[in-house]
Amino acid sequence: MAVLFSKKVTKRFGGLNALSNIDLEVKEQSIHSVIGPNGAGKTTFFNCVTGFYIPEEGEIFLDGRNITGLSPDRVTHLGVSRTYQNIRLFKNMTAVENILVGMHPHLKSGLVGGILHDRRTMREESDAVAEARRLLRFCGLQGKGDLMSKNLPYGEQRRLEAARALANKPHLLLLDEPTAGMNPSETHEMMNFIRRLRDELGITILLIEHQMRVVMGISELITVLDFGEKIAEGTPAQIQKNPRVIEAYLGQGAASGLSSTMTSDATA
């Protein structure tokens, strides 16, 4: 079953086609990567899915429901969360407070409850804090809840951003270059973490990533974009051997060196 399905999605900026007739299907509880050179349209596609951009043509479906043109908050309410290439934490808030921000769509206490601070509001706040600390433990950040996010190491800030995305209880999680700026050890930890999101929480993952080691190591299916067009789609093994992909993105040397990487990462 497809969690996400796009049909001939086209997005233009002036006279430039940032996306042209993109068909993409993301299967339930899969890890699906989107790769391509800078400017290929990867983040533009994410922005169309999440409602930040409205495509000029085509449709996007989430669990069979047409979400084309819905506002970002409506898409979030329907169970889509996202992280960004550049970390967007609230630097002067604690780790727990950052996660509470991500829970906002699901909190029932409104403005009046917040002002009166009645019993129901207090109970909901207590439950929310407990859930935030549970998410921190799941993300390997136990004991860090009361630290300012700006004081966490870079890799932990990445995981905190993921924890905040999980606070929305998503069934589709969009990750935009989750290993950007990480050292090899942090990258390996993030790869295992992404697998856990799928295996333990049943979350479907749509991933943008430039590190081919990561893409080949965790993806079940890979879609390749170039100049806003889909030029290939297939398994890691198929993508490595695709001449158009090699020419447009990987380069002959990169492609020839990926087989051993894929094997070692798949068994890690």
Feature-to-residue mapping (PLM):
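Glycine-rich phosphate-binding loops of nucleotide-dependent enzymes
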Residues: 1-268
